[in-house]
Amino acid sequence: MWDRPSDQVMNVVLLNPPFHPRYSRSQRSPAVIKSGVIYYPIWLAYATGVLEQSGFDAQLVDAPAAGHSLPAVLDLVEASRPRLVVIDTSTPSIHNDVDVARAIKGQVPEAFVLLVGPHVSALPEASLRMDATVDGVARGEYDHTVRDLAQQLAGGGDLKAVLGLSYRTGDGAVVHNPDRPPIEDLDALPFASQVYRRHLRIEDYFYSIARYP
């Protein structure tokens, strides 16, 4: 493995996709909460930090919190031309999330579109077969799966080397790589709070007992 893309820094967009306004996708029961509570995209933030540690140009976008529409997200993606787009999913929003993936693939067809989250982890093959524009699914903890995938894409490597990845081959077959072991050294992960500071607006988030958590 290598720490940086060989020729130039590869762009990666990590997206909490647009759905209902203020949809809190990262909480235990994803929903629009009457109190207005909306959680930070913590899992995407960890993956963003890991990518940055490895030398990639990672951009974390939280569309529901920031109020970004799908056209706004497509404009952002068009401007950055990422090689990898990581899209968070949830069961209530999965059809919408796949629609967003399809729209992004139409905007930047060269991008590898990867779905992450509990729903696609539980149903990787069914999720891939929802739409041919979805290139892959990261199963389980995806912090290092996303990093390893970015490294393989940047270096023209073999997707078979990426643990925890399910992906579609050129002929449409679905391949499930071996599972990735759970992360043992959690202290090696970057602080999510620093990722929030670099990429998000604290005023976009709310927790009823702490205002801006």
Predicted regions and their residues:
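Acidic, low-complexity intrinsically disordered segments
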Residues: W2, D7-P213
